[in-house]
Amino acid sequence: MKNFLQQINSYIKEAFNAGKYLYNGLSVTFDHLRRRPVTVQYPYEKLIPSERYRGRIHYEFDKCIACEVCVRVCPINLPVVDWVMNKETKKKELRNYSIDFGVCIFCGNCVEYCPTNCLSMTEEYELATFDRHNLNFDNVALGRLPTNVTTDPSVKPLRELAYLPKGVMDPHEIPASDTRVGKLPEEVYDWMRPESNKNKDKVSNSNN
């Protein structure tokens, strides 16, 4: 009789522990059911980076003293500092400064150790290009002020239009006659070309 009661007691404890574990797991699941979706339909929707986000590096040419500290602290010796020694002033004269963001790991060491604070991290993260050589930014491109995501014109319409219609991002079972959500590279190129060049192409095609 005593062994029977002990077995029942152990069975009840195991059932209680199993129910407790099940409750803990389902509580997390049900908690997420009450939340809004967190999926971001990029590039139609964009996230606002945090204050310490390590995005594209901003460079101030006038502050740089060509000390090359950024090159020494970089794990891959990435920044290219082109300078010459001025024999009259016996000081370095900076000619060009460049960073290849196709190789950069955005560790922030160059910004941390710069003695003149001529380097800073921005919130700009849209660096995609059709040619990888375009990711090599010189001092002019690095000196360009970053685009603020909060004032980006492509973000504002989404606040007004809320979410895109259902199925607009789904690539399956869409007729070939329907227009694409985005444009192909050649379509963007045609859109950016001047009207005079387009008219010349039309005339040449008609003559052929």
Swiss-Prot record:
InterPro entries the UniProt entry points to: 4Fe4S_Fe-S-bd (IPR017896), 4Fe4S_Fe_S_CS (IPR017900), NADH_quinone_OxRdtase_chainI (IPR010226), NDHI (IPR004497)
GO-annotated molecular function? 4 iron, 4 sulfur cluster binding; iron ion binding; NADH dehydrogenase (ubiquinone) activity; quinone binding
Query: What family name appears in the similarity comment?
Result: Belongs to the complex I 23 kDa subunit family.
Cofactor(s) needed, names only, are:
[4Fe-4S] cluster
- Binding site residues for [4Fe-4S] cluster 2: 74, 104, 107, 110
| Catalytic activity reported | a plastoquinone + NADH + (n+1) H(+)(in) = a plastoquinol + NAD(+) + n H(+)(out); a plastoquinone + NADPH + (n+1) H(+)(in) = a plastoquinol + NADP(+) + n H(+)(out)
Could you tell me which residue ranges the 4Fe-4S ferredoxin-type domain spans? Answer: 55-84, 95-124
Instruction: Output the superkingdom of the source species.
Output: Bacteria
Q: What class of enzyme is it?
A: translocase
Under the heading NCBIfam families, the entry gives: ndhI, NuoI, PRK05888.1-3
Positions binding [4Fe-4S] cluster 1 in this chain are: 64, 67, 70, 114
Q: What does this protein do?
A: NDH-1 shuttles electrons from an unknown electron donor, via FMN and iron-sulfur (Fe-S) centers, to quinones in the respiratory and/or the photosynthetic chain. The immediate electron acceptor for the enzyme in this species is believed to be plastoquinone. Couples the redox reaction to proton translocation, and thus conserves the redox energy in a proton gradient.
Q: Where does the record say this protein resides?
A: Cellular thylakoid membrane
Which PROSITE patterns does the record associate with it? 4FE4S_FER_1 (PS00198), 4FE4S_FER_2 (PS51379)
Species = Prochlorococcus marinus (strain AS9601)
Keyword Heme on entry: no
User: Which EC numbers characterise this protein's activity in its record?
Assistant: 7.1.1.-
Q: What does the entry comment about cofactor binding?
A: Binds 2 [4Fe-4S] clusters per subunit.
According to UniProt, the name of this protein is: NAD(P)H-quinone oxidoreductase subunit I
Keyword Secreted attributed? no
As for membrane topology, the entry says:
Peripheral membrane protein
